[in-house]
Amino acid sequence: MGFDLYGIKPKIKKGSYKPPVLDWNKSTEAEKKKYFELSNQYEADNVGVYFRNNVWGWRPLADLVCKLCDHLTDKQKSFLQSNDGYEYSEATALKIADTLEAFVKSPQAKRTEQEHKKAMKKADAHNKKVNNKLDALRMDAIAITNNKDIAPRDYPKDLKDKWDRIYAEHDHTASYPFALKNVKEFIKFLRECGGFTVC
């Protein structure tokens, strides 16, 4: 699961062509493999066609755009966090690219990346402690029920309530990486996409 951004009017290099879609039911594995190779090459040659991030990588990038891009409306900011197919114009894409480019060139960019890595490391250490508590609680549930395969939803009520409280202590910062490399790739896409949709 993730976020797929498609260029509306991407710049296409001369001589570049998109492979025709295959009939998956009638194609051999070799034909499918070749199709993916050609599709990947087409997207690499034409960076404005497609940009993808898994949900974990997209959230920090979209948050950065929302934080820095005062020119975006609340609606535009909101739809960055949704894959409903909202469209952003070419002018908007270029403004976002300019804003992110200025950020990347600033000392703040490296600091942001380093601070995010520290926060992830701290959250990861915290989550290990939370997971240890959950593991201990699981042993209690097994001892009471004599069911070594018991899932938390089937714990006795008092243990299930305790599991819910402990699980809520997880710090999800550990799950959302931020990398300047990703920001730079997004800038390339924005400059070449001719406007984009978020799906």
Give short role names for the model-derived ranges.
Residues 1-199:
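Acidic (Asp/Glu-rich) sequence patches and key acidic residues
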